[in-house]
Amino acid sequence: MAAAPVLEFERPIADLEKQIEELKRLAADRSLDVAEELAPLQKKLGDLRIQIYQNLSPLQRVQVARMSRRPFTSDYIKHAFSDFIELHGDRLFREDAAIMAGWARLEGETVMLIGHERGRDTKENLKRNFGMPHPEGYRKALRLMKLAEKFQVPVLTFIDTPGAWPGLGAEERGQSEAIARNLLEMSQLQVPIIATIIGEGGSGGALALGVADRVLMFENSVYSTISVEGCAAILWKDGKSQEMREKAATALRVTAADLVELRVIDEVIQEPVGGAHADHAATARALRETLTRNLEELRRLKPDKLVRRRREKFLRMGQFTE
């Protein structure tokens, strides 16, 4: 697999990492002790990561959210859960690999996991359709949510998609109906639902897994009704320039900090220094702890109260005073 491209603002980090690796390799080849030389470089690297990642612009966070080096649903399954059993098919047409789902255990408790899944190379991206589900993916998700409800098992969803697949076949097979059906059914599911935005949350394709009692979001994830490129192209007829994309990202308020302030999401999960891609295992631990805590709180609520509070939560969105 080819190395993932480095983002422009990350280049100073990549250059310093390369310098450190070369020094380590030289020390190993010649049996040299370079501890004194390494220490200041590693400190400089840590300081540089903090400096860069504490000052990301909204557009830079969009770029981070889309990185192929970020943990995907499959990575969180590997690091945060145990005993995963994948389930397939919508029982109506076909399997959709853009949605990964199945039974798992979280700290010993059975849960139903459902998440968008992307690819890291061409072969995987074609298999996963670049993380953009067909209607069959959303119908598979709903089938498994209803199965979880039958056995009174909590549902955990992971959101990471540019949007639902807009192809002709998907539209002919009822893409909009599949998304709308999920919104309706999730609003009245009788078990706890926690949605976590782990990367890019794009439009209705994200919302189809996002009607939940708690909506969590990683620090460098984004969530919006349209891509920044699409917004810039519609409003300013320029979806390619850095300036217009930055303007759109700021106007859309796509970041976790913006969305928790707007009460669209409930909690921000902090990422390791340098982003989630810098340490998959540490990011998964943070996710596991946050999910466990929220699930414990939701478990105390009776189903009717759970559903009522969930519906009220979403009905409150968009209210304002003049």
From Swiss-Prot:
Q: Which GO terms describe its biological process?
A: fatty acid biosynthetic process; malonyl-CoA biosynthetic process
Question: Which top-level group of life is the source organism from?
Answer: Bacteria
Pathways involved: Lipid metabolism; malonyl-CoA biosynthesis; malonyl-CoA from acetyl-CoA: step 1/1
Compartments where located: Cytoplasm
Any one GO CC term of this protein is: acetyl-CoA carboxylase complex
Span-the-membrane segments of this chain are none
Q: Does the keyword Nucleotide-binding apply?
A: yes
- Please state every residue range assigned to the domain named CoA carboxyltransferase C-terminal: 40-297
Subcellular location, principal: cytoplasm
Pfam families xrefs:
ACCA (PF03255)
Q: Listed GO molecular functions?
A: acetyl-CoA carboxylase activity; ATP binding; carboxyl- or carbamoyltransferase activity
Does the UniProt entry include the keyword Lipid biosynthesis? yes
**Subunit record text:** Acetyl-CoA carboxylase is a heterohexamer composed of biotin carboxyl carrier protein (AccB), biotin carboxylase (AccC) and two subunits each of ACCase subunit alpha (AccA) and ACCase subunit beta (AccD).
Task performed by this protein? Component of the acetyl coenzyme A carboxylase (ACC) complex. First, biotin carboxylase catalyzes the carboxylation of biotin on its carrier protein (BCCP) and then the CO(2) group is transferred by the carboxyltransferase to acetyl-CoA to form malonyl-CoA.
According to UniProt, the name of this protein is Acetyl-coenzyme A carboxylase carboxyl transferase subunit alpha
Tell me the classification of the organism that encodes this protein. Bacteria, Pseudomonadati, Gemmatimonadota, Gemmatimonadia, Gemmatimonadales
This protein's gene is called accA
